[in-house]
Curated annotation (Swiss-Prot):
The protein, known as: Phosphopantetheine adenylyltransferase
E.C. no: 2.7.7.3
Gene Ontology CC annotations of this record: cytoplasm
Any one GO molecular-function label of the UniProt entry: ATP binding
Residues reported in the UniProt entry to bind substrate: 10, 42, 79, 93
Pathway: Cofactor biosynthesis; coenzyme A biosynthesis; CoA from (R)-pantothenate: step 4/5
Species of the source: Bradyrhizobium sp. (strain BTAi1 / ATCC BAA-1182)
One GO process term, biological-process aspect: coenzyme A biosynthetic process
Length: 164
């Protein structure tokens, strides 16, 4: 049986934190599905297509280098439902701090109640990427700040183009 993991998020934009999670997650599964959430009530900076392109450009090579299958997709329903539809046995969630942990534990409990066969696997962020949040990256980029320490080069270029 193939071990399929779903790594959900908005990826608006992809950060070095996301990259860190993927570097760890590819060793836990045979196939990693990075699922870009489409929330109709939110106005992301990057379109769904742009976010999918970033995911492919930045994250897919990490999976390939580790010999892990890779897929990027979108979803607009409950994350656990998307995982179930994808045939995933686990959902990958990155943890930066205690606030993330408290929220994610509550979510994991509810998800396990709804779909008992899917486990939530927590991946602790490496020290260097713990402070990185996509929201802060967007704010820094919008004000002309240098985000090169927080995102891959291709994403930094996309942010620069978006705000110029």
């Amino acid at each position: 049986m193939q071990r399929i993991a779903l790594y959900p998020g908005s990826f608006d934009p992809v950060t070095n934190g996301h990259l860190d999670v993927v570097r760890q997650a590819v060793h836990l599964c045979d196939r990693l599905i990075v699922a870009v959430g489409v929330h109709h009530g939110k106005k992301p900076l990057f379109s769904t297509e742009e976010r999918l392109a970033m995911v492919h450009e930045v994250l897919e090579p990490v999976a390939a280098a580790a010999g892990c299958g890779f897929e990027a997709s979108t979803y607009d329903d409950l994350t656990v439902t998307a995982a179930q539809k994808a045939g995933a046995i686990m959902m990958i969630r990155g943890l930066r701090d205690g606030t993330d942990f408290d929220y994610e534990m509550q979510l994991a409990g509810m998800n396990q109640t709804m779909v008992p066969g899917i486990q939530t696997v927590f991946v602790p962020a490496s020290v260097a990427v713990r402070p990185i949040a996509a929201t802060l990256v967007r704010q820094i980029a919008a004000m002309g700040g240098d985000v090169s320490h927080f995102v891959p080069a291709a994403v930094a270029a996309s942010l620069k183009a978006k705000f110029n």
